[in-house]
Amino acid sequence: SSWWAHVEMGPPDPILGVTEAYKRDTNSKKMNLGVGAYRDDNGKPYVLPSVRKAEAQIAAKNLDKEYLPIGGLAEFCKASAELALGENSEALKSGRYVTVQSISGTGALRIGANFLQRFFKFSRDVFLPKPSWGNHTPIFRDAGLQLHAYRYYDPKTCGFDVTGALEDISKIPQQSIILLHACAHNPTGVDPRPEQWKEIATLVKKNNLFAFFDMAYQGFASGDGNKDAWAVRYFIEQGINVCLCQSYAKNMGLYGERVGAFTMVCKDADEAKRVESQLKILIRPLYSNPPLNGARIASTILTSPDLRKQWLQEVKGMADRIISMRTQLVSNLKKEGSSHSWQHIADQIGMFCFTGLKPEQVERLTKEFSIYMTKDGRISVAGVTSGNVGYLAHAIHQVTK
């Protein structure tokens, strides 16, 4: 008998499964609304011109390929913390933070989860919004933490369940961990408004919860990086010492380069140094040190004034295209004569939209119209273009009328 006779076939990844089925479809009108990557208005992958310029500058320098330190490229870490917390952040100025480079957002989450598993002595309990990004559960679970949920999305309004969220958060046991999406909540596209964030912060402070922020879409949600980081900065201003995961996959289009950062805001600079030493001890047996190329690209963009300015315009361009596709989809549904209210599609923010379509309607869209999405009715608005938005609206109307 074999060593691995007892190993069962695992379930396929639900999102990658959508892409596989899409690839097999021969219909010329087919649409893939499952994939979490930006597409231009011709439906093609998009490399930001600022990224191309940064790559050219890096290539011209003929740099070596030596190892980075365990914590990553120093100037990248500093620039990432400034981008997230704001250049005038008191936490930055007083040096009471530590930022390490990570293998994109997933790697940052896992480093954070591993650190909590080892050093957060108060609780094993992590509370995720319901629903949350599918990968959050295995990341925290595999790091040895216990998962729970708090209400977040209201299927009746396709919006934020503020009453349910505040009620559930108020009942979370003291000194537990709460995960918060900083902006462009994935998968729902539903974010709290600033006044609602203030109420959440009050409860987090009152219950002495540890706030764990995941910010995968800074700049990509509203088109304004400062606006998208508002909640994180507000929490820190309120004296809540958070940790934060950043990803440059979406906002710089550096998906396959795996560029991210993990930041811990501490009580003082001495605590930050101690935390940093332990983060390095966790990282070393995971992957020794992070990859070089993507961090160089991001760092070059963030630290050169001209490139940074160009990049901010390009991020706004991507965000604006997505916002415009949302409004076009809503107006096309009205044109089709749909009697349903689709306003939530325009109200939600970021790459993803929770349409409110039921699993059987999703199935019909795939079978009858070759439109692919996950069963929960989540669509990637990045897959919608001015060329196919009319077809999508027609198809949605057909399965919902």
Swiss-Prot record:
Residues with Phosphothreonine modification: T19
Residues annotated with N6-succinyllysine modification: K44, K61, K78, K93, K130, K156, K198, K267, K280, K309, K334, K367, K375
MF terms in GO: kynurenine-oxoglutarate transaminase activity; L-aspartate:2-oxoglutarate aminotransferase activity; pyridoxal phosphate binding
EC assignment: 2.6.1.1, 2.6.1.7
UniProt signal peptide: none
Asymmetric dimethylarginine found at: R284
Gene name as annotated: GOT2
Name of the featured protein: Aspartate aminotransferase, mitochondrial
Binding site for substrate: G36, W133, N186, R378
Chain positions with N6-(pyridoxal phosphate)lysine modification: K250
